[in-house]
Amino acid sequence: MSFFNIVIAILAFGVLILIHELGHFVLAKLNDVKVEEFAIGMGPKLLGIKGKETQYSIRALPIGGYVKMLGDESKSDDPRAFNNKSSARRLSIVIAGPIMNLILAAVLFCIVGMSEGIALPTVGKISANSPAQKIGIKAGDTIVKINNYSVHTWEDISFNMALNKGEGIKLALKNNGTIKKVTLVPQYSKKEKMYLIGISPKFIDKPTIIEGAKYGTSETVTMIKTVYLSLKMMVTGKASAKDVSGPVSIIKVTGAAANAGFIRLVNFIAFISAQLGVMNLLPIPALDGGFVFLFLFQMITGKKVDDDKVGFVNTIGFALLMILMIVVTIKDVVYPINF
């Protein structure tokens, strides 16, 4: 793992943290909440600038960041305190961070699509004597479902194919307004080291800004579905803990993406940004999603949960997340990704 990889990874992750925390910061200001500190990084402070009422700082450990608001950890009687705002206002502040990451992902995917062209979920070419040709799939067929999962991008197809172990695949194809359903068994490719059905996508070489924006949005939706499907596979035992990547693997992959070119790096940052946005929305204590769940509960039931109890649960949740980070870091060392 080179020094270059580490620097690129820190800079890339720093951008993701900045955008995420900026979402919290802007919504806090819009809701007239006093922000005491805006920090990029955790741990000891390296640099700091004091604004009118907010301390802006860069900290030593590039593993996160935070927006410290008056009344977000302890009660305050100040009307500008976070704890004195309505559940709806607090919800808007908390959810803004993950949403900003998803917006960033969509913008970056749009840039990638505009730069490299867009692979559509439509068949462009078919390999001779392939399962696709034998079953009657034709160029121009658009794949709308694969194994009952809706398809919006070519990556939806690629993800499902990457998981295939030689089992039959159900496809729903659309052509000229007609839907056709087929089932085919993929063939193993020694070259690609995976099972394939023998199709390649139709490309838009020079997409318009509208097509690029649509691609960016669709690609982000695909990433959201991929994260939740991956989590489902982990919970049901269909995926191994070895497949979980930690900081070491992310640094390696970021470096490899940078070496492959600027657009590849942008694509990977978009991928991580989408993942960061989705993972932060999980209803887990100490994550934004835990607060989203809490504030929605309070809005629906009209009942306020004791702040001290919330603080205790979040402290436990944060400790468990730190333990998980240590575990996946150790896993990265024991089961490293090699290039």
UniProtKB/Swiss-Prot annotation:
Q: SUPFAM superfamilies recorded for this chain?
A: PDZ domain-like
TM region(s), chain numbering: 91-113, 275-297, 310-330
> Quick one: a GO cellular component term?
plasma membrane
Gene3D superfamilies referenced in this protein's UniProt entry, alphabetically: 2.30.42.10
This protein's major location comes to: membrane
Task: Work out whether the entry's keyword set contains Repeat.
Answer: no
Subcellular location as annotated: Cell membrane
The protein's required cofactor(s) are namely:
Zn(2+)
One Pfam family linked to the record: PDZ_6
Alphabetic keyword roster: Cell membrane, Hydrolase, Membrane, Metal-binding, Metalloprotease, Protease, Transmembrane, Transmembrane helix, Zinc
What one GO molecular function would you report for this record?
A: metalloendopeptidase activity
**Membrane topology recorded in Swiss-Prot or TrEMBL:** Multi-pass membrane protein
This protein's source sits in the domain of life called Bacteria
Indicate the enzyme's highest-level EC class: hydrolase
Give the protein name, as stated in the record: Putative zinc metalloprotease CA_C1796
